[in-house]
UniProtKB/Swiss-Prot annotation:
Keywords assigned: Aminoacyl-tRNA synthetase, ATP-binding, Cytoplasm, Ligase, Nucleotide-binding, Protein biosynthesis
Biological function: Catalyzes the attachment of serine to tRNA(Ser). Is also able to aminoacylate tRNA(Sec) with serine, to form the misacylated tRNA L-seryl-tRNA(Sec), which will be further converted into selenocysteinyl-tRNA(Sec).
Organism whose genome encodes this protein: Bradyrhizobium sp. (strain ORS 278)
Protein's name according to its UniProt entry: Serine--tRNA ligase
Pathway: Aminoacyl-tRNA biosynthesis; selenocysteinyl-tRNA(Sec) biosynthesis; L-seryl-tRNA(Sec) from L-serine and tRNA(Sec): step 1/1
Length: 442
């Protein structure tokens, strides 16, 4: 959420930042609403002040036995009682209109973010490792997985498209990957493990930016009785399945003031995630690349404004370390202004090399690490008390550390062997009971 005072003070800078995002200038429209809002609030406050003053004057007039003046003042107060609800309603309506408009505007990019329209304008930052050479043509994970316990047919019977059932060694390997990531972040990177709810309220979804703009991308759960309730009640009482643990973890500080000494607050969770993928029709229809349900390790940091940029670099390094320990080839790119997420000021994507994808392999996203400034904090009313005693908005950051399903794909395709089995990376073998190969009989 944007600060209207900042827009009021720097309308040209605000519009310039929106233009970098590929949006039209909005400051004039917002400031016009703000002017109406401020005028309505002023009128309401003046009416309230006059009513209070007139009430005091009535007592003074009666004390002075000036019945004529007392009667006139009582008539004035009666009129104010009639008009005040209308003025208060107008002020509330203008306030809600401004909040509604502001809530639909994405975060503004930092100055160092490269300008661009889409993923083609993203900038490569660095590369780790190199592509492996194989004595055979590498296969895609879904071709390898059929014999190893990857079952899309059964999943379709249970839930429809974009779901998978994993069995035997593959189920164990996916669990091992998630546990390895969680252990790395909690024992070496200083994150606190959290096991959050998977169902959250509307205001929680709003806080991190999923609502109102991305309502159609969410899965919603409702109690049976609400299915026959009026739409307004259904919408108010529904719960959203988290599209990422970022939603729950970040909102742990909503509507609170934390002590500066508690920052940075670093949280991590391994959870299922649920996405409707409303805009992904026809994309990645094969395999596990794009699923309605997937597992992910999420990293969230709550910081002061002065430390958020450094924390962003630290978070990226933590996510990278996962892939380095797995010895996977990857690259880091800085997203351009036209490709960033709604709540982000700046985003790094980590793309892992998958040798079985496309024609000869491809880089695919496995992690996004974003700094959001105070954008989410304003939506959540999340603040910290600085050393001077004044409450200020925190800065929030989030990143995948990493997507477990896509890490499984990368391990399968990178460590595949000519006989169709998968060599288990050294770092995962302790989580696999010492198993070194996932084969059809594993």
């Amino acid at each position: 959420m944007h600060d209207i005072k900042s827009i009021r003070d720097n309308p040209q800078d605000f519009d310039a930042a929106l233009t970098r995002r590929g949006l039209s200038p909005l400051s004039s429209q917002l400031l016009a609403i703000d002017e109406r809002r401020r005028a309505a609030i002023l009128a309401s406050e003046q009416a309230q002040a006059r009513r209070n003053a007139a009430s005091r004057e009535i007592g003074e007039a009666k004390k002075a036995k000036d019945e004529g003046r007392a009667s006139a003042l009582m008539e004035e107060v009666a009129k104010l009682k009639t008009t005040m609800p209308e003025l208060e309603a107008a002020a509330k309506q203008a306030d809600e209109e401004l909040a509604r408009e502001l809530s639909a505007i994405p975060n503004l990019p930092l100055d160092e973010v490269p300008d661009g329209k889409d993923e083609h304008d993203n900038v490569e930052r660095h590369v780790f490792g190199a592509r492996r050479n194989y004595a055979f043509a590498p296969k895609a994970h879904d071709d390898i997985g059929t014999a190893l316990g990857m079952d899309f047919e059964s999943a379709a019977k249970l839930s429809g498209a974009r779901f998978v059932v994993l069995k035997k060694g593959l189920a164990r390997l996916e669990r091992a990957i998630g546990q390895f990531m969680l252990d790395l972040h909690t024992t070496e990177h200083g994150y606190t493990e959290v096991n959050p709810p998977l169902l959250v309220r509307n205001d929680v979804m709003f806080g991190t930016g999923q609502l109102p703009k991305f309502e159609d991308d969410q899965f919603w759960a409702v109690r049976g009785e609400l299915l026959i309730a009026p739409d307004e009640r259904l919408k108010a009482e529904r719960l959203g399945l988290i599209p990422t643990a970022e939603v729950a973890l970040t909102n742990l500080v909503r509507e609170s003031i934390v002590d500066e000494k508690e920052l940075p607050m670093r949280l991590t969770a391994l959870t299922p995630c649920f996405r409707a993928e409303a805009g992904a029709a026809g994309r990645d229809t094969r395999g596990m690349i794009r699923q309605h349900q997937f597992t992910k390790v999420e990293l969230v940091s709550i910081t002061t404004p002065e430390t958020s940029k450094d924390e962003h670099e630290r978070m990226l390094a933590c996510a990278e370390e996962v892939l380095r320990r797995l010895d996977l080839h990857y690259r880091v790119i800085t997203l351009c202004t036209g490709d960033m997420g709604f709540s982000s000021q700046k985003t790094y994507d980590i793309e892992v090399w998958m040798p079985g994808q496309g024609d000869g392999g491809a880089f695919r996203e496995i992690s996004s690490c974003s700094v959001c400034g105070d954008f989410q904090a304003r939506r959540m009313d999340a603040r910290y008390r600085a050393s001077d005693g004044k409450p200020r908005f925190v800065h929030t950051l989030n990143g995948s550390g990493t997507a477990v399903g896509r890490a499984l794909i990368a391990v399968m395709e990178t460590y595949q062997q000519a006989d169709g089995s998968i060599a288990v990376p050294d770092v995962l073998q302790p989580y696999m009971g010492g198993l070194k190969v996932v084969a059809a009989d594993s």
